[in-house]
Amino acid sequence: MNFERLEAIAYKAMGKRKSHVEREIGHVFFHGKRVSNSVLLLRKTIFPEDASHDEILRCAGLFHDVGKGIEPHARTGAVLARELLKEELTESELNAVCEIISVHDDRHPEDDRYSPWIKLLQDADHLDHFGSQGLWLSFTYRAYMGQKDMTELPAFYESEWDESIPRTRSHLNFDFSRKIFDEKVRYERDAISRLKLESEGFYI
């Protein structure tokens, strides 16, 4: 696969698009780029001897959210990706990429119907919403929604965010993914603890 061309196609489709009112322009493009890298990190750690699907994973990561904003976005995205990539991939590559895209949001860790490649992409996608990126999403969301003071953010983390963590963790497919997730969650909690302190005028 020619990833220089694929990235150009992805940018044209997503780079200047706003998928949701509370997200920055191009969010899904940059999210896809990160996922296309992190899914390979997961594969190299979890299945170190099998690089057979690396190009498929990388391409699926890049385009997995191309349907974002048109629900069900995974299945819509598979249709859009097939059209966008029909001149770039072989039929078997196209089928494999679109299969991953079509079910990347159907998370059932105990279900064996999905291949390890699908599960890797699912985990990479989930993990990109936490850690530094999680903080960015929280700040930009509140900015777009008109919240003017950072003192409001810790309350969200102490309620909705905290309540969502066990559920999100349960959707991850691999122990290594859960390890990364736990580290990202710790990082966010520490950052918000410091933010809460400083938002009230304290430092220590």
PLM region spans:
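Short alpha-helical hairpin
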Residues: 1-18
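Divalent metal-dependent phosphate-bond-processing catalytic cores, especially two-metal-ion Mg2+/Mn2+ enzymes
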Residues: 5, 20-49, 89, 110-204
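Amphipathic, well-packed alpha-helical segments that form the structural scaffold of globular domains
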Residues: 11, 15, 37-40, 44, ...
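Short amphipathic alpha-helical interaction patches enriched in hydrophobic/aromatic residues
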Residues: 18-21, 43, 65-67, 85, ...
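An active-site-proximal "capping" alpha-helix that borders the catalytic cofactor pocket
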Residues: 35-36, 73-87
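His-Asp-centered metal-binding catalytic motifs of divalent-metal-dependent phosphohydrolases/nucleases
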Residues: 52-73, 77, 97-107
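Membrane-interface starts of transmembrane alpha-helices
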Residues: 90-95
